[in-house]
């Protein structure tokens, strides 16, 4: 995959011989290969943590989901992600959104856990949904299924299951995860504003924050560089390289966000009477743009 960054610089650690790459501040200017490396490191780290925790549970405490494989696929997370990115031409925003979707899905579907049995199907589903929701052009599910190594019918089921669980809130926005959690508890697609308490969603509307989606992904980008930018920070050793951001770039601001789950979210648009929530439009756009196989 090509590098899209003119800002990427590299030097060698004299003590360990590990290349040090200074990434661009903007994830859209980062090499897609570097993004895949970072996200793969994050995923492998999460898998290691979750599977270590799962060993303490009995079999009857583990719930199988549609994302489970019978056995772990014989392709690494990194190589699988590279395959999806290369043959489906995944864009930067799609790569980052696949990571964001982990927090989103786990919020409304506690039975889902990212592990060696679920990671591959989740990645395939996440990148398929994100591509359709965020990109102007995309392929059919038949293509994505072939690249991902599953049957098209299975991918259709996974995609539909994901969309229903997150109420079609597939665009990363401030307070999106919070709203999904409230909706899941209330069993409603549109939340009564009185149930939101002190959460002021008007200030988070698309009109007031047109770059909300970018800002959420930017937080995830900076956070994963902080957490797994170092080669020694993750069990994934696919690429021997250390990643850092430019020295004048802040990592993740702790105000208004959380470090483990950057609970961004979405908001109602009080300036438009026909759109109570911008996510209702997201669902309409997704259905309109999705093509049958």
Swiss-Prot record:
GO molecular function: cyclin-dependent protein serine/threonine kinase regulator activity; protein kinase binding
Post-translational modification: Phosphorylation of Ser-267 by PHO85 is required to form an active cyclin-kinase complex and for function.
Membership in a protein family: Belongs to the cyclin family. PHO80 subfamily.
Cellular component GO terms, alphabetical: cyclin-dependent protein kinase holoenzyme complex; cytoplasm; nucleus; Pho85-Pho80 CDK-cyclin complex
Activity regulation, free text: Inhibited by the CDK inhibitor (CKI) PHO81 in response to phosphate starvation.
Name the record gives this protein: PHO85 cyclin PHO80
Quaternary structure (record): Forms a cyclin-CDK complex with PHO85. PHO80-PHO85 forms a stable complex with its inhibitor PHO81 under both high- and low-phosphate conditions, but PHO81 only inhibits the kinase upon phosphate starvation. Interacts with transcription factor PHO4.
Outcome following mutation: residue 163 to S: Temperature-sensitive allele
Compartment(s): Cytoplasm; Nucleus
Residue positions where Phosphoserine is found in the record: 234, 267
Pfam families, A to Z: Cyclin
Compositionally biased spans, kind Polar residues: 254-272
Keywords linked to the UniProt accession: Cyclin, Cytoplasm, Nucleus, Phosphoprotein
Organism: Saccharomyces cerevisiae (strain ATCC 204508 / S288c) (Baker's yeast)
InterPro entries: Cyclin_PHO80-like (IPR013922)
Disordered, as annotated region: 254-293
Biased composition annotated in UniProt, kind: Basic and acidic residues: 276-293
Gene Ontology biological process terms, A to Z: intracellular monoatomic cation homeostasis; negative regulation of calcium-mediated signaling; negative regulation of macroautophagy; negative regulation of phosphate metabolic process; negative regulation of transcription by RNA polymerase II; regulation of protein localization; vacuole fusion, non-autophagic
TM ranges: none
Chain's role: Cyclin partner of the cyclin-dependent kinase (CDK) PHO85. Negatively regulates the expression of phosphate-starvation-responsive genes under phosphate-rich conditions. The PHO80-PHO85 cyclin-CDK holoenzyme phosphorylates and inactivates the transcription factor PHO4, by preventing its association with the transcription factor PHO2 and the nuclear import receptor PSE1, and by promoting association with the nuclear export receptor MSN5, excluding PHO4 from the nucleus.
